[in-house]
């Protein structure tokens, strides 16, 4: 498929179809998803001369993302610098992509610098860029600061989304602030944001770790009834916990929902679930 997309772009001229930045960008994105980095970079570099197509800001942002995925952050930053020399203005997406990459590899001073540079150049942060900052704070164990940032963006008229709340909840759980995590989860509804499958997964996982199996059961059941199933490991942990506190009936309810899942779990996974329940019955 990626090779076919590349050939189609290369042969467009043979069929009287003019190549455009839009067709170049579409081809590059297909190559990027297939992790065909060399081919995507060649297309970007050869575009203006070989194919008579001028790259645009989307082309550059695609290459920035590619270098970030490759772990070559210096090259990614150079692409942003090259944009300005070419008369193209780096945008919020450029900065967000770079910030996320630098934060992820622990170079927070560069990430903070990019944030400040973005603001100085007149770009208004989007929710996605705020989420990148919140992710960084959570990873650094600064859950309270992450929560404060979420509060500020809400006051500023930017509505936090499921990603924001999931990060804040995870941040509080990681700090041991379990009650705050549950408070944030409860506050989602009041602020017009319903939890999605990832939020449920986070809640059930950490509640099981804290051995709050009653609430974990209720949330897991609610999630499964929406056809959102936590990870196999989380379900295993919940079933073991319910059996340990003699909540056999709750375990059976979870098992009933698990059995009705489409697509179904594998034979091996189902066997593990059943074994957990049977161990309680046999006293093992």
Each predicted region: which residue ranges?
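TPR/TPR-like (Sel1-like) alpha-helical repeat modules
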Residues: 221-229, 239-246, 253-264
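Leucine-rich repeat
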Residues: 1-57
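Alpha-helical solenoid repeat scaffolds, predominantly canonical TPR units
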Residues: 8, 43, 79, 114, ...
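Inter-helix linker motif
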Residues: 16, 35, 51-52, 71, ...
């Amino acid at each position: 498929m990626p090779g076919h997309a590349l050939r189609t772009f290369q042969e467009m001229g043979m069929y009287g179809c003019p190549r455009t930045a839009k067709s170049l960008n579409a081809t590059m994105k297909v190559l990027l998803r297939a992790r065909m980095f060399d081919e995507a970079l060649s297309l970007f570099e050869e575009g203006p001369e070989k194919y008579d197509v001028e790259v645009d800001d989307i082309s550059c942002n695609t290459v920035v993302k590619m270098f970030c995925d490759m772990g070559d952050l210096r090259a990614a930053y150079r692409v942003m610098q090259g944009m300005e020399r070419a008369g193209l203005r780096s945008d919020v997406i450029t900065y967000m992509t770079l910030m996320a990459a630098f934060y992820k590899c622990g170079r927070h001073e560069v990430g903070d610098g990019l944030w400040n540079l973005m603001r100085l150049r007149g770009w208004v942060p989007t929710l996605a860029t705020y989420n990148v900052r919140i992710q960084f704070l959570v990873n650094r164990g600064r859950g309270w600061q992450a929560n404060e940032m979420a509060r500020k963006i809400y006051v500023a008229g930017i509505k936090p989304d499921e990603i924001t709340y999931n990060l804040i909840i995870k941040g509080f759980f990681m700090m041991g602030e379990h009650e705050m995590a549950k408070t944030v989860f409860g506050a989602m509804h009041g602020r017009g944001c319903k939890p999605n499958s990832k939020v449920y997964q986070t809640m059930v996982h950490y509640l099981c770790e804290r051995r709050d199996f009653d609430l974990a059961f209720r949330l897991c059941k609610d999630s499964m009834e929406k056809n959102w199933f936590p990870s196999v490991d989380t379900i295993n942990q919940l079933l073991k916990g319910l059996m340990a506190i003699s909540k056999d009936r709750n375990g059976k309810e979870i098992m009933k929902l698990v059995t009705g899942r489409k697509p179904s779990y594998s034979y091996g996974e189902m066997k593990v679930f059943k074994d957990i329940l049977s161990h309680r019955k046999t006293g093992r």
